[in-house]
Amino acid sequence: MDYINAAILGVIEGITEFLPISSTGHLIIAEQWLGHRSDMFNIVIQAGAILAVTIIYWRRLLDLVLGWREPENRDYAAKLIVAFLITAILGLVVKKLGFELPETATPIAWALIIGGIWMIFAEWAAARRPPHKQITWLVAILVGIAQIVAGVFPGTSRSGATIFVALLAGTGNRAAATEFAFLVGIPTMYAASGYELLKTFKDGGAAGEDWTALAIAFVVSTIVAFIAVKWLLAYIRSNRFTLFAIYRIILGVLLLGMTATGMIA
């Protein structure tokens, strides 16, 4: 993989990983022209995106750790931990069952379309409720489950699934739902990336990697994800997610069309 392709894929990952539009769908399209990505490359660009969100929320994370004696912080942290543990346990079950990701774009396209329709419904339902910021235990449990659903059905979007489950479960404030979804995603994605990294090294998958290309992709993904998430957090203060829902539906239809015409597998 040349350095320009590595940078382009880093940009795509950085933009799409935490926006509710599915990084998987975009990377599949890019793969048709930029070549197949190794497991190591996928891990590296995702790690860059996770680092960006960690940097954005470092003060919030530090407050939760240092202020653990405060009931509000302790309660919030406990809900984050429970959501993460639910994802971790269900993730191990999915691995044990031998679940395999789809090899064609069609299921991903349908996940994009259905997810887009679901997002519009969730926004409509949330608008009919008081815009409170409370994260309930039900929200925490459902967010943990939603992360696994997004992993099992690529194209769903982890951020999209978790944010809109939180909205439907009673957190009527978009900013509060997004923050909880992103904070849960930090340990979840670090754990998943760490697991895959160890597995890749164990299987010899790191041999022959172009470490310069990996470094470029990592740095680009980190910078772009930082900008994208900062923009998203500002955007949702006064705007709904409807624009993303429409975009998902259009992308899903485009993928179905490209599959039907043989442009992609």
From Swiss-Prot:
It holds the Pfam family BacA. Its main location: membrane. GO terms for molecular function: undecaprenyl-diphosphatase activity. GO terms for cellular component: plasma membrane. It is found in: Cell inner membrane. Keywords: Antibiotic resistance, Cell inner membrane, Cell membrane, Cell shape, Cell wall biogenesis/degradation, Hydrolase, Membrane, Peptidoglycan synthesis, Transmembrane, Transmembrane helix. GO terms for biological process: cell wall organization; peptidoglycan biosynthetic process; regulation of cell shape; response to antibiotic. The chain crosses the membrane at residues 38-58, 80-100, 107-127, 135-155, 175-195, 213-233, 244-264. It comes from the Bacteria. InterPro entries: UppP (IPR003824). Its EC number is 3.6.1.27. It catalyses: di-trans,octa-cis-undecaprenyl diphosphate + H2O = di-trans,octa-cis-undecaprenyl phosphate + phosphate + H(+). It is a multi-pass membrane protein. HAMAP family: Undec_diphosphatase. Catalyzes the dephosphorylation of undecaprenyl diphosphate (UPP). Confers resistance to bacitracin. Bacitracin is thought to be involved in the inhibition of peptidoglycan synthesis by sequestering undecaprenyl diphosphate, thereby reducing the pool of lipid carrier available. Belongs to the UppP family. This is Undecaprenyl-diphosphatase. It comes from Rhizobium etli (strain ATCC 51251 / DSM 11541 / JCM 21823 / NBRC 15573 / CFN 42). The lineage of its organism: Bacteria, Pseudomonadati, Pseudomonadota, Alphaproteobacteria, Hyphomicrobiales. The gene is uppP.
